[in-house]
């Protein structure tokens, strides 16, 4: 591979099938992408982070706040599939800038206008403008940055979402009012847009063009079928059920904990947010457990790792159901957060395996769509269940879902094993 001549200089805002081989430049850009996605994830959770304060102040009801977040992910979910396909065909850097700028505008509007219906519409539009932000980020990491660093970059970018979620609750606890969450988010996103644009110009001279696009029929892979067939036969589509469940249970343990503790044990909302920091940090430990201990030293198969983490997750969910006191409830929620996050990283490693077919962006988009659908169910369905029947029903539902996650993960393991065997034979 050679750099383009000056007359045909590469432009990351237009060219695809390009990559960096300069490790220093690649790693610096990744650090920016890591911080960027952490902040983006923080801004996506503005309503969740301030949920207890918004409800306590009487600004919105629990159902109204849940509906705003649910509609965000209801719009976000199908568009992630579109975003994944688009990120495989167009510049992911340009798509990221569109998402950053649009989200900054949405956060600024909500800071100045607290009308419920305005919030509902603007936050839904915010979801739509971010349609390719995550698929674009994942595409850059798994295809454009230095490929020898790919495993570590997938590991660290999974930490970014945990860090972003943690920041959303820390910021909510520190700021004097819930409205300031949106002011801080808007300012941060505007700054990120500018930095991303400057970085794009800087990267052009370091980019190298691939010899040819990596596609299903390029000879890079022995599989010659359609994308749908690839995802079906590899077990990817069945894996989407554990993805949804992981969000319902794992994400629920992080985002609903302050409200749950407030309503069950009458804890102060601010104290609940601080306790939630422990739960989110436990989730971060799950990521570290996978990368530093389990994979690939002890567990060499991503799907086997998912089964192991799902089994331990089920044990902590049982403890959560029968926990009689607040300390035991918090400990069980920490365990749920830890092993659900570990399971999520194994899923990310599995999705990265589709890079050899040129479908890693599509896989990331579809997987993120499934996760977003889980968050829709979490923020409206689970909140509605807690409002009508109470938190005990939520506990038993999470227990049943944790068991279903293991069943589906085992199914995917055997389907994928057969798929790999047939690939080798062909």
Predicted regions and their residues:
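Extracytoplasmic gate region of multi-pass secondary transporters
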Residues: 47-48, 234-287
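Juxtamembrane intracellular "pre-TM" segments in multi-pass secondary transporters
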Residues: 13-23, 204-239
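Cytoplasmic helix-loop-helix junction between adjacent transmembrane helices
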Residues: 122-160
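Helix-loop-helix hairpin linking two adjacent transmembrane segments in secondary transporters
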Residues: 156-204
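Helix-to-loop junctions at the C-terminal end of transmembrane segments
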Residues: 79-91, 286-300, 386
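A late C-terminal transmembrane helix in Major Facilitator Superfamily
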Residues: 354-391
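C-terminal transmembrane helical hairpin of 12-TM major facilitator-type secondary transporters
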Residues: 300-346
């Amino acid at each position: 591979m050679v750099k383009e001549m000056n007359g045909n200089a590469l432009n990351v805002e237009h060219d695809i099938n390009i990559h960096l081989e300069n490790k220093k430049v690649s790693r610096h850009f990744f650090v920016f992408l890591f911080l960027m996605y952490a902040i983006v994830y923080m801004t996506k959770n503005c309503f969740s982070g301030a949920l207890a304060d918004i409800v306590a102040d009487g600004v919105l009801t629990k159902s109204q706040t849940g509906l705003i977040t649910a509609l965000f992910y209801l719009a976000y979910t199908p568009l992630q599939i579109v975003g994944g396909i688009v990120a495989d065909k167009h510049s992911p850097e340009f798509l990221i800038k569109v998402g950053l700028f649009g989200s900054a505008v949405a956060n600024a509007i909500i800071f100045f206008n607290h009308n419920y219906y305005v919030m509902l519409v603007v936050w839904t539009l915010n979801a739509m403008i971010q349609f390719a932000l995550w698929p674009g980020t994942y595409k850059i990491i798994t295809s454009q940055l230095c490929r020898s660093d790919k495993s570590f970059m997938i590991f660290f970018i999974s930490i970014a979402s945990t860090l972003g979620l943690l920041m959303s609750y820390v910021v909510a606890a520190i700021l004097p009012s819930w409205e300031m969450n949106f002011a801080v988010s808007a300012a941060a996103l505007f700054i990120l847009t500018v930095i991303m644009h400057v970085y794009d110009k800087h990267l052009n001279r370091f980019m190298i063009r691939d010899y040819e696009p990596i596609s299903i029929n390029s000879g890079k892979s022995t599989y010659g079928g359609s994308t749908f067939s690839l995802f079906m036969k590899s077990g990817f589509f069945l894996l989407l059920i554990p993805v949804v469940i992981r969000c319902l249970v794992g994400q629920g343990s992080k985002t609903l904990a302050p409200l749950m503790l407030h309503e069950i044990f009458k804890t102060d909302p601010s104290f609940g947010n601080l306790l939630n920091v422990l739960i989110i940090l436990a989730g971060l430990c799950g990521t570290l457990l996978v990368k530093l201990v389990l994979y690939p030293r002890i567990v060499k198969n991503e799907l086997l790792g998912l089964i192991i983490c799902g089994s331990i997750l089920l044990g902590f969910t049982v403890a959560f159901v029968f926990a009689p006191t607040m300390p035991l409830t918090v400990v069980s929620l920490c365990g749920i957060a830890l092993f659900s996050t570990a399971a999520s990283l194994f899923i990310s490693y599995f999705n990265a395996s589709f890079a050899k077919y040129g479908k890693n962006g599509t896989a990331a988009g579809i997987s993120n769509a499934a996760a977003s659908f889980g968050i829709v169910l979490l923020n409206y369905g689970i909140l509605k269940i807690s409002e009508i029947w109470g938190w005990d029903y939520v506990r038993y539902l999470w227990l049943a879902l944790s068991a279903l996650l293991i069943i589906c993960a085992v199914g995917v393991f055997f389907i994928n094993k057969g798929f790999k065997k047939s690939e080798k034979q062909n």
